[in-house]
Amino acid sequence: INRMLQKRYGMLQWEQGSGKTLAAIAMGLYRMQNQGIHSTWVVSSAISIRNNWDVVLPNYGLSYVFVENLEDLARIKPGDFVLVTLNKLGMLQRHIKKWIKRRHQNIMLALDESDEISNPHSKRAKSTLSCFRRCRMKLLTTGTSTRNNISEFAPQLELLYNNSINMITWCRTTYYCDREDNSINSENNAYYGRPIPAYKPGYALFSACHLPEKTTVFGMTERTQDIYNADELNELLAKTVITRTFEEITGKEIRRIHQVPLQFLPEERAVYRMVMEEFYRVQREYFASTGNHRKDAMLRLVQQITLLLRVAAAPNTLKEYNGGTPLKIVTAAEMTAEWENEIVAIGVRHQNVLNAYAEAFREYLPKRPLFIVTGSTKTFAQRRALRKTLRDSGNGILLCTQQSLPSSVNFEYVNKVLIPEMHFNNSGMSQFYMRFIRYTSTEYKDIYFLNYIGSLESNLLQMVVAKEKINLFMKGQDTDLNQIYDKFGIDYNLLALLMQKGVDKEGNLQIRWGEQQIA
């Protein structure tokens, strides 16, 4: 914090549960009391503002204003913390920008969960940049500045430095993809030694320097997990970001990640094979047509992947499934039953999968209290109240969607976590499982990933590992894949289990089994 106070702009990339909120409060108080700042504006997602900041600030007896309408702007006094959600910022953008301009930009911005503006084309990113890019002091806090690829860091960098001399591009070479043979070619950087320009030209330049786009089938584009001009990017990160892991801040590593590989039962493999090889039979059962043949062709592979992952999560959610309770759900119930006196948390990603697990747990463990949480059924206040109810149960089961506990709703007393349905990156999953791992925690936390080996979940796990390598680079840790495999508890040949994309005899896209033998 001392190092960050010596600069006007910076980012704290501290892992979830490490005290970013307290650090932002300390910096805001110091700036207002000693450096003449009028007020500290805290901007974040609605759940973070309401469940965290709106609770923490009154607990410390600090003066603050929660901006929910225009009248609230008139109540702001010097020395106040000002809370604004990203959605409300978009609605009041013009008025907030005018208010800040009248105070000569003499405020401090604390953007909590700054990866929320990683998409430069989103309304929340545009409104945040419009209102705060010129303010005097800026602090960005996040658990991970990138989720999927390097280019997501560009809007956060632009917000910090406002395209000034602090963000000069020193990359002599830019890269682009040749549309004809899909190869990566290089050329001299026309902006070498100049600040990265604002908005779209700047995002395009940042991407060309560090992560060129590749064109795929149907003209769609993809971003890989590669890094170009890594040394130049590392220099920029070194002066901007202070990174600390949970272990470095708390002095203890209490996380233990375990993989639970499972084999498909015959009935499960049959429905999985049907979706993989005869997707045309069930496509319209689960996905509506857009009315445009070209769009339907573009979406076909994406829809097939989505349905394959749904089969892997809960095969009994498909009408074509003829078996009993799926092995993954039975395994989750058996593991929960073994922890008879433990509170267990289970996080899935979709409502229909959650319903399948809820039905099974009511059948197999009728005496255990079951608490179901989704974003649509539980309000912020109810989720806060659940903390005490779940603790008092002694051995309750918290079954929830991972999105319903993304930030600021903490259950630090839960030690067993099951994740039967993976996210597309570890950043999304860690936002969930770090709700149970806080700097005040003292006991070991066991996190179990339940995966069907030989299914598309193996590919998803490999993609999570590849993206985590990028995230670790952004945190100043240049590691190889073997170390990340160890971190995730992967002790089997994952690469041999990956499914592959190919074409059939008629030239149509097709998903195929990997090197593994399927009985």
Per-segment meaning from a language model:
Residues 5-6, 15-19, 23-28, 32-33, ...:
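Conserved Helicase C-terminal RecA-like lobe
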Residues 16-17, 135-150:
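Conserved helicase ATPase motor motifs in RecA-like P-loop NTPase domains
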Residues 21-23, 36-59, 150-152, 349-352:
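Conserved Walker A/P-loop ATP-binding site and its immediately adjacent core
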Residues 47-71, 160-164, 364:
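Conserved helix-turn-beta segment of the N-terminal RecA-like "Helicase ATP-binding" lobe
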Residues 83-88, 98, 102, 122-136, ...:
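Inter-lobe coupling linker of SF2 helicases/translocases
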Residues 92-94, 115-127, 149-150:
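Conserved ATPase-coupling elements of RecA-like P-loop NTPase cores
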Residues 368-463:
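Conserved RecA-like P-loop NTPase helicase motor core
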Residues 424-430, 437-518:
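A conserved SF2-helicase RecA2
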